[in-house]
A protein has these predicted regions:
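Charge-rich, low-complexity N-terminal segments
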Residues: 21-170
């Protein structure tokens, strides 16, 4: 009602109760959160305590988007996201993330091969990990949904007090 009234007062086209008059401009979203994922990292460029190897209990919030819901009316079927849960279990659970540029990474992994479950990525800041997760999960979701749905954003929680997000520019 409000949209129709505003449109009549300001000569603006109205999309009716569904919003945009162009269905391709609509987007549905939903999100799934995976909690209590223990893994470690070290910020080798940090001047403080974060330069030491340390761990957190992380949570990964994945926001999905689509323009057209599936035949059940879902953006994604939460029960069908086992491929993401498996990737998290195999790559992050009790892992140690190292930045590609960390000067001690190679030596540590060589000297202590059984001490670490390593994952080497470009940046191990919370922001960098969020970007890595986006770049990993988005192609997986697109493949699983035949391109109908995608990852819109990753919000990565470092314990309960800090978080960072990554989403590509529109």
């Amino acid at each position: 009602f409000l949209a129709v009234w505003l449109a009549s007062r300001h000569n603006v086209p109205c999309g009716g109760p569904m919003g945009s008059p162009n269905p391709s401009l609509r987007m549905f979203t939903c999100s799934k959160t995976y909690r209590d994922i223990p893994f470690a990292h070290r910020q080798h460029r940090h001047e403080g305590h974060c330069s030491f190897l340390h761990g957190h209990n992380w949570a990964i919030e994945i926001e999905f988007g689509c323009e057209r819901l599936d035949e059940r009316g879902f953006v994604v079927d939460f029960g069908g996201l086992g491929f993401l849960k498996l990737w998290i279990a195999e790559n992050l659970d009790h892992a140690c993330l190292f930045a590609q540029s960390d000067p001690v990474r190679e030596q540590l992994l060589k000297d202590y091969p059984k001490l670490f479950r390593p994952l080497v990525i470009e940046s191990v800041s919370t922001e960098g990990i969020a970007q890595h997760l986006f770049e990993t999960f988005d192609p997986m979701v697109r493949q699983e949904t035949a391109g109908r749905a995608w990852v819109r954003q990753i919000i990565l929680h470092e314990d309960t007090k800090n978080k960072a997000s990554y989403q590509p520019k529109a």
